[in-house]
Structures are given as C-alpha cells and as structure tokens.
Amino acid sequence: MKMKLFIAIFAFAIVASCNNKKKHPTTDIDVARAFIKDILENNYKEAQTFVLNEDMNNQYFDLSKKEFESKSKEELKLYKDADIIVNEIKSLNDSVTVVNFSNTYKRNIKNEVKVVKVNGEWFVDLKHTFQQVLNVK
C-alpha cells in the first residue's frame, strides 16, 4: 500500500513539474515585455530565447550581455527591482511592432525594442535597437 502511494505521489510530481515549463509569449507586447524583464533581471539565458536567431542579432545580444554584466552588483539589483515603463507602442504592420520603454530605475533613458513575427511567432530584432543607439551617438 505504501509503495502504491509513493508511486502515485512520484508520478504526480513528475507530471506537475513537466507542466511548469515557461511558454513562449504569443503576442508582440508580451514578447517585448518578457525580453525586457529578463534583461533587467540579468536572466540572459531566458532572454535569448526571445531573440530572432540571426548572426547579427546574436552578436548584438552577446555585446549587450557583456556590457550589462560588467555593472556592479548594487546596480544590477536596482535593475532587477525596476519595473518596465512602456512609453509608446508602434504597430508598423501585422508583423512588426516597436516598443519604446524605460524602467523605474532609469526613467529618463528611453530605449526601443523591435519585435517581428516570423513563422507565426514573435521575436526581438536587436538590429533596430542597436541602430537607434548608433544614431544617438
């Protein structure tokens, strides 16, 4: 009897843990928000799942990861505790959206992230973000 109970509990635990997988957001805004939050929380492994898998995007992602990780622990904590402020959402067409955002830690710094729909899924296209940064400098 104890063995059957143990097996039942063990099987339930396995099924429950399999259902805890994080699902890829299905809307442009949700992908942008999840990506930004993962970056703020220094969760690059999860953030990279939202990036459009292209060489240039991967290079930009690695560059921003190195820059962000070079910050002090205190500053990383401030970013982690920050909330996202969505300043503007521009739907350019049915497969491209640009989200202008800042965060509660650095309200005065506004950034943009472009999300594109590829094969029915939304992804972050960092080429737009880095082009914006280069145009400012």
Describe the residue ranges of each PLM region:
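Short solvent-exposed beta->alpha transition segments
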Residues: 24, 29-30, 34, 44-92
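A generic structural signal for short
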Residues: 23-24, 101
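Residue-level detector of alpha-helical recognition elements and their boundaries
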Residues: 11, 50, 62-63, 130, ...
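Exposed beta-sheet edge and beta->alpha loop/turn motif
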Residues: 76-78, 83-137
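Bacterial signal peptide processing site
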Residues: 19-21
